[in-house]
């Protein structure tokens, strides 16, 4: 493994730098509670903010939401046998295992692993009893959404919702762990939507088209997405015309579809068969999100370009952007898995792993991603653009206090980091280094995310690399992400040069979709196969050997083999394709 940081990593356990609440709190009992006679069981949703985490930064009083104020929640249910599902997800994707390639079918999931109808109805009855309405159960029975009030939340889950500020943004959160009556303790996993301040964000860096720069490592310039197949040696592979690809978005994509049509027309490509899918409430907000527009443009055009100009279908799973916290994204992930149509799904979004763990999202979504892996689906997730400071990169980075991004830290996804890409004068691959652009004028670090999870255990397939003992390490692989060597993307009809690990992930998605088409969509979740194959055959990747993803002497360094900034490096698709044909990878 490549060498890590020169200075010792300290876990990011104190998540909140700015929480504007006074400490003069008599007790949480002042907020009230459900009847003492109720016997409560814990859930995965912790107190999102507690007195011990509060820093008194203003004179604003701590106020509980009025009982009648509206609240939208999503209840995540436990699998009937989560351990067995995770074992199955490993077995069907582990070369040499007797179950290899025997992916879980939707009907099998419902009969063996999904919560039973009786369990679902028990939770529905509890919600209805406490005043929730518009209760909706998703087809695979993993999520139940409902509309209610702060009073209903307190009655149903034994926690108040209070107003507070985080990083200058006002919102609300639960000040006690969410609980359920004991008879629901083995059914309910998380109660989501109890905080609305921290949300997942895109992983992109937008700029104007820059002039090419010739350096010792090669030429650094922006790239038409159609150039990535040549650069990463995929030209000999078939297009992804036989593979369906998914993209997770927040809000609508009407402008994205117009920009995608302009991209295909400008490059002489056929129009893409697309479908948009609303994944949350039918009354949700699925209008175009101007802030995220460049993200969905980057995702779709980079996927199609890397896929050789064709995919069977491009499915946009649109999250309700009005949903509380990250509940909309959780619903979008689940819809893609419940449908089980897209073979590979792009996620160019992420947020602080510690926050995801605190509100229960980490556990809820990990069940969804594990189901996807068991079904042979692959989620590709950007590793983050904050270097080693995903949780504390709001101003100048916090020294040796490192953190990573969720959902990239899930062991059931492929985490994709970022590089700075150099090409030859003829446009072929020359070299890559760790993507790190240093601090911007606001003191924010722009660099590839990488490190280790505080909450996720090390998967067995990572045993071939060292690193922090027992922890999920990330990223797994990397591709181009630097804004200066990024993709030339149509955004509102105009070309912009965009980078970030939001570029790296869709490059992989498009290339992986080509390999899926070449292998009749028989390839499953490839993490175990990647680690096994690359560790024994290093020529399958472009090893990234220089660079760092921190600042001021902190962060992790690149070197030979797997490392924290770039994982194994970028894939050589022609060599990987030949390896698959020769070694039965995925069959």
Swiss-Prot record:
It comes from the Bacteria. Pfam families: Peptidase_S8, Pro-kuma_activ. Residues 33-215, 586-587 form a propeptide. Autocatalytically processed. One of its GO terms (molecular function) is tripeptidyl-peptidase activity. Optimum pH is 3. Ca(2+) binds at residues 543-544, 559, 561, 563. Binds 1 Ca(2+) ion per subunit. Disulfide bonds join 352-391. The keyword Disulfide bond applies. Changing residue 437 to A: Loses both auto-processing activity and proteolytic activity. Changing residue 480 to A: No change in activity with casein as substrate. Residues 1-32 form the signal peptide. CDD domains: Peptidases_S53, Pro-peptidase_S53. Changing residue 299 to A: Retains auto-processing activity but shows only very weak activity with casein as substrate. Keywords: Calcium, Disulfide bond, Hydrolase, Metal-binding, Periplasm, Protease, Serine protease, Signal, Zymogen. SUPFAM superfamilies: Protease propeptides/inhibitors (SSF54897), Subtilisin-like (SSF52743). Its main location: periplasm. Residues 219-583 form the Peptidase S53 domain. InterPro entries: Peptidase_S8/S53_dom (IPR000209), Peptidase_S8/S53_dom_sf (IPR036852), Peptidase_S8_Ser-AS (IPR023828), S53_propep (IPR015366), Sedolisin_dom (IPR030400), Tripeptidyl-peptidase_I (IPR050819). It is found in: Periplasm. It catalyses: Hydrolysis of the B chain of insulin at 13-Glu-|-Ala-14, 15-Leu-|-Tyr-16 and 25-Phe-|-Tyr-26 and angiotensin I at 4-Tyr-|-Ile-5. A good synthetic substrate is Lys-Pro-Ile-Glu-Phe-|-Phe(NO2)-Arg-Leu. PANTHER family: PROTEASE S8 TRIPEPTIDYL PEPTIDASE I CLN2 (PTHR14218), TRIPEPTIDYL-PEPTIDASE 1 (PTHR14218:SF15). Pepstatin-insensitive serine-carboxyl proteinase. In vitro can hydrolyze various synthetic peptides. Also shows activity on acid-denatured hemoglobin and on casein. This is Sedolisin. It comes from Pseudomonas sp. (strain 101). The lineage of its organism: Bacteria, Pseudomonadati, Pseudomonadota. The gene is pcp.
